[in-house]
Amino acid sequence: MNSEVLLIEGASLMNIKLESEQISKLMNYLKLIIKWNKSYNLSAIRTMEKGVYKHLLDSLSVIAYIKDKSLLDVGSGAGLPGIVISIMRPELLVTVLDTVGKKCRFMQFAKTQLQLKNLNVIKNRVENYQIEFCFEQIISRAFSKVEKILKLTQHLLCNNGEYLLMKGAGFQQETLPYGVDIQSLCVPEILGKRYLLIFRREK
């Protein structure tokens, strides 16, 4: 079974119907990751098949929780999940942020190659990143512990904004904020449980 079929069928199992343009861009994005990996070491994933599950489908698992205006992906690395979200939601302003130059160069290249006009690539430390507006949602897939993420990014989130923190089962050992909403994520072929921690900032 080829990688494109794995993507389509995996997304279908998550109740996500992909359009042809989305499939094309997602597959081309994954090919870029695999190609650049040879020189840039962007990810431990080296094959298209594993990339479909570990990168694309894992990132797609949060799509139902994404709102309409602005999203910041902190510690985005190769652009996960931010670039996947940008492909799926072209009307949404997506900012991907990382401190590592080679990863930001890759994300900028992917933006150009995939013509993602709604994507903004930032090389900076999140605690030093300053903006004139605020983000409706802040997402993180593999950046840091919950307590540290909240501390470093609080100046960037709108009142009534949301944190979306993607975690494995180990999050249970962390200090969690009061009122956190814990959602199980269904990702085909992923060993180990995946969770989305949702924390809403009140006025």
Curated annotation (Swiss-Prot):
It comes from the Bacteria. It holds the Pfam family GidB. Disulfide bonds: none annotated. It is found in: Cytoplasm. It catalyses: guanosine(527) in 16S rRNA + S-adenosyl-L-methionine = N(7)-methylguanosine(527) in 16S rRNA + S-adenosyl-L-homocysteine. GO terms for cellular component: cytosol. SUPFAM superfamilies: S-adenosyl-L-methionine-dependent methyltransferases. Keywords: Cytoplasm, Methyltransferase, rRNA processing, S-adenosyl-L-methionine, Transferase. Belongs to the methyltransferase superfamily. RNA methyltransferase RsmG family. Specifically methylates the N7 position of guanine in position 527 of 16S rRNA. This is Ribosomal RNA small subunit methyltransferase G.
